């Protein structure tokens, strides 16, 4: 039943991602009943497939820590992407201590404890983080995109990721936090490269 559920949710995610560049990222979140995030009131997935949600809030000190990542102005789009990776990792650590996902392992490698997130949940949670950065004017060079999907490729399972667009060029990048365990920097590579089967371990 779990496999059927994952396949169904992946199919729905794929449907929602058709024409992803023309869709607001909130559309992906709305499928899981995740409302537009606020610093003091936001929701994230707390299980694979995003079947369970946690309603959380950042304290003033926590949000100050996140803002500090962007405190000095980014010098280039590439520099901002590096900061985004660090900020997403910082947010994952904070969220993990609040809802038990701190033991989330890399990929789908379960360890028999805590709460494991799959790529569907990771894409949603990272999109929540990115929308908060955008809402709070922390992003200078990028705009949050609709999550992206890649299908069966080179013997690999379907996969989802959050995404961003570079404002001046329109270049499209992943912000993929699924490959590594909770609190590690996300993968940020061109979407075309990611769709071709990118894996950081290759």
Predicted feature descriptions by range:
Residues 16-18:
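C-terminal motif of bacterial Sec signal peptides marking the signal peptidase cleavage site
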